[in-house]
Structure formats: C-alpha cells, structure tokens
Design a protein with these regions (language model features):
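A Rossmann-like FAD-binding core segment of flavoenzymes
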Residues: 9-17, 25, 32, 99-171
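Rossmann-like NAD(P)H-binding beta-loop-alpha module
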Residues: 69-117
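Short glycine-/acidic-enriched loop or helix-start segments at secondary-structure transitions
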Residues: 48-50, 92-93, 115, 147
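Short beta->alpha linker loops
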Residues: 62-65, 87, 140
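A general structural signal for well-ordered alpha-helical segments in protein cores
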Residues: 47, 67, 89, 122-126
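ATP/adenylate-binding site constellation spanning eukaryotic-like Ser/Thr protein kinases
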Residues: 43, 55, 85, 118, ...
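FAD-binding core/adjacent interface of flavoenzyme oxidoreductases
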Residues: 2-81, 153-171
Length: 171
C-alpha cells in the first residue's frame, strides 16, 4: 500500500537531519533523501514511582496484548482503578466503562485531560464520566498499591483506600 503511494519505510538510528538538502543521516553513514519526512520515534510507557506498581494485577495499556489482558479481568462488577485521565487514559477509560466494571479514575491534576483541555472542557468530561457511573478523583495521587486477599488496595493521597481487582496505569 505504501509503495503505491510512493512512501518508503526506513528504520534506523538518526544522527542528524539536513533540512536544506532534505536528507536524513543515519547512524552508520547511510544518507536517505526525502521529499516529505515523518519521524515516528516511538515511545515506552512510564512506570510511576509508586510502591506496588510492579504487582501482576497492575498493568499498563501499551500494546494489544496489554489490552487483551486487561479485558480478561475487567468484567462486569470487577473493581478497576485507572491511574491517569490524560488523552490515552480517557480512551482506555471509555473501553473500561463499557466493560461493566466498577471504574474509579485517579488523576493527579485538577481536571481530566489537563494538557489538552481547559477547566470547563475537563469538567465536562468528568461530568460525562460520572453520569455513566465512573468515580473520578482529580487532584489526587496514588500513594501505594498493596495486595489484600486476592485483590489490591489502592491508597490515595487523600488518605482513602480503594479496593481493586485490577489497576491500569495510563500515566
């Protein structure tokens, strides 16, 4: 498909980009010319420095495999805590809300999607979530995650503890 559109896919480490010559200099000496350039550098999930975040019932949602593992646990009436209500967190939130799980969202900023939305828009999203039975906690941090019985207890910065069958990190 890409070849039909005249698009080349090149993987490698980039040493420099010469915009004047429309060239990318790759590590190892190869130079690749371009008409238009898209750099897709990829990324990796950030693991927050929270006690217990390495527990097997705590998952990031970064890959299709992660999403499948989460959907196996997030069933109706299970308790799920979602850490992070940014753009990606809200996409995950929607899927979790549809699962029928009892969903609690923890966002350390004062509103949902804080990097993209002002107070009004962030609060509209919060109201929408709460109207669908999602508990949203803003200006709150997860302090620790501990195993209790067969599940987890999530301790928050306001002193509350929330039971969880699964914690999803979208930080």
């Amino acid at each position: 498909h890409y070849k039909e559109l005249g698009i080349s896919h090149v993987e490698g480490l980039v040493d420099s980009i010469n915009q004047e010559k429309s060239e990318v200099n790759l590590h190892g000496g190869t130079t690749v010319g371009y008409d238009r350039l898209l750099v897709a550098s990829g990324s990796t999930p950030v693991t927050p420095p929270i006690e217990g975040v390495d527990h097997p019932l705590v998952s990031s949602c970064w890959t299709l495999e992660d999403a499948r593992r989460i959907s196996e646990v997030a069933k109706p009436n299970t308790d799920v805590v979602l850490m992070g209500a940014g753009f990606i967190g809200c996409i995950i939130l929607e899927a979790l809300a549809k699962s029928g799980a009892n969903l609690t969202v923890i966002e350390m900023e004062d509103r949902m999607v804080p990097r993209m939305m002002n107070d009004t828009a962030g609060n509209l999203i919060k109201d929408w979530c709460e109207s669908r039975g999602v508990s949203v906690n803003t200006s709150t941090r997860v302090e620790s995650i501990t195993e209790v019985g067969g599940g987890l207890s999530v301790t928050l910065s306001d002193g509350k503890s929330i039971p969880a069958d699964l914690v999803v990190s979208a930080t």
